[in-house]
Structure formats: C-alpha cells, structure tokens
A protein has these predicted regions:
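Acidic catalytic loop of the alpha/beta-hydrolase fold
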Residues: 186-190, 215
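Hydrolase active-site cap/lid region
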Residues: 103-154
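Catalytic active-site module of serine/aspartate enzymes centered on a nucleophile-bearing elbow/loop
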Residues: 213-263
Length: 263
C-alpha cells in the first residue's frame, strides 16, 4: 500500500513488485480510491477534489475491498492462497496495514516500511485546527508537482469519530501475527523514534534499520534506472527473507496485478 501523496506506480515501486513476483509471490499493488489519481491518469494528482476528500477510514475500506476482490475473483483461485495473505505498507500506509491486520483474520503477516506510529500527531491530521475549521479546508504544497493539495475538514472529523479504530499503538500491541519493521536511519519525514515505538509495542516484531536510507529508501520519482537503489534492494531482500522463513507453501510465480486498472 502506498503512502501519503503516493501512488502505486511512484518511483521504483514497479521494480519492487517485479522483485517480489520473481521471488515466487503473487503481488498486488493498487491506488487508494481518493489518492488524487484517476483510472485514466493514475500517476500524480489530476483529481485534487478526491484527494481533499480522502481519510484514514476510506483507506481501510479500500484495502478491505481489495482483499474481498481477491477472495471472490475466480481467476485467482489456482494462484492465491487466501488463507495466507501478507500486507506491506509504506509511510502512512504502514499504519493502515497494521490496523487492517489487527481487524482481519485473513492477514497472516505484515511489513511496515518507514511506517508511522500515531495518526494523531501527523500534520495532515491536525495542524492549525482553528483556521482549518474556520475555512473548511487547508492546503499542503506538493514539493515535487508544486500543486496546492486540499485537505477538507472532514479528514479531521473522520479521525475524531474513529479514534479508537485508528489507534495504531493499540493495534500493534494486539497484533498476533509476525511483523517486520523496516526504517531508514536518515528518514526525516517519519523519524526513527516512530519505528522504535512500534518495536516497543510489539516485542515479538523483527526490527531492521537500513543505514543511509531516507524516507523512500533512496529512490525517487521518476525512477528511470533498471535497478533499485542499494537501500531499497536491502528492503526487498530483507522482506523476502522474512516472508520465506514464515510461509510454508508458495503461490504461482511471476504474478503482478494493478487492480486499480481492472474492472
């Protein structure tokens, strides 16, 4: 799952997907429904109105829809072990996959990449509340595209209404499945202390620090190279080793699905 201001084809995610597929995993990547992309233009943010109406519970519901879609799609029956599903989330989606893993018994293991530990402390959740409530919207400038990206007050209201469900600490403490935490020691977007909190809340988790890695493990968008950065390659190899130690049977190799592109 992609993070805040992200999308499934950002940077080197396609190379990451290929690496998992080549490792004999059926790998699905998708865009959250309100990430700002469209079916015709899934890269970048042509639909800022949708972006402004996104929230955490919509992302949880989107992930639920993808899990259900996998479960009922007959063409996957011979390829996917529905009793052995793993989730991987980057940044904000690290919190999303932890919450969903705690809710859904179909999930058997989870990996968080530069994952957040507390939605209540993210600037997208709080910020200048008085001005946000007064204006009904606040804007964040995208450093790459230079777009002024709206965040409607519904984002905050939805968080307040669903605080119990959106409690990452509680979900992590209750987690009964294997959890791999991966974080870069040069991450300035989600600091190392957030990874340390996740480890503290789940002492059974596996904790891997990638030396010299920033928030996106030293890849960027666009990524025109044919190979991953050294740091992202370490993320992939660590993740594959984690999965393969835990999974007793593998599904059909070389399968990647962009499910947002399919009806």
């Amino acid at each position: 799952c992609h993070g805040y201001k992200g999308f499934k084809d950002w940077g080197a995610w396609n190379l990451v997907a290929e690496a998992f597929a080549n490792g004999n995993f059926f790998f699905i990547k998708f865009n959250f429904s309100h990430n700002g992309g469209t079916a015709d233009q899934p890269i970048d943010f042509p639909d800022l109105e949708a972006f402004g109406n996104n929230n955490y519970t919509k992302e949880l519901d989107d992930l639920e829809s993808v899990l259900n879609w996998i479960s009922i799609n007959s063409e996957f029956k011979k390829e996917v072990n529905l009793n052995d599903i793993s989730l991987l989330g980057h940044s904000r989606a690290g919190g999303i996959v932890l919450l969903k893993a705690n809710e859904d018994k179909r999930i058997k293991r989870v990996i968080t990449l530069a994952g957040v530990c507390d939605f209540s402390k993210r600037s997208s959740t709080i910020g200048d509340l008085q001005a946000w409530k007064r204006n009904g919207v606040k804007y964040v400038v995208n450093g790459r595209t230079k777009q002024k990206m709206p965040h409607y007050i519904q984002f905050y209201e939805d968080f307040i209404q669903n605080q119990e469900r959106l409690n990452i600490q509680k979900a992590t403490e209750n987690l009964q499945i294997p959890h791999l935490i991966i974080h870069g020691d040069k991450d300035t977007s989600v600091l190392m202390n957030e990874a340390e909190n996740l480890k503290k809340w789940n002492q059974n988790s596996v904790y891997k620090i990638i030396k010299g890695a920033n928030h996106v493990f030293n890849v960027a968008h666009p990524w025109n190279k044919e190979t991953l950065s050294k740091e992202m390659d370490e993320v992939v190899s660590t993740s594959l080793s984690f999965f393969k130690r835990l999974i007793s049977s593998f599904i059909k190799k070389n399968k990647i699905w962009d499910c947002v592109d399919r009806n």
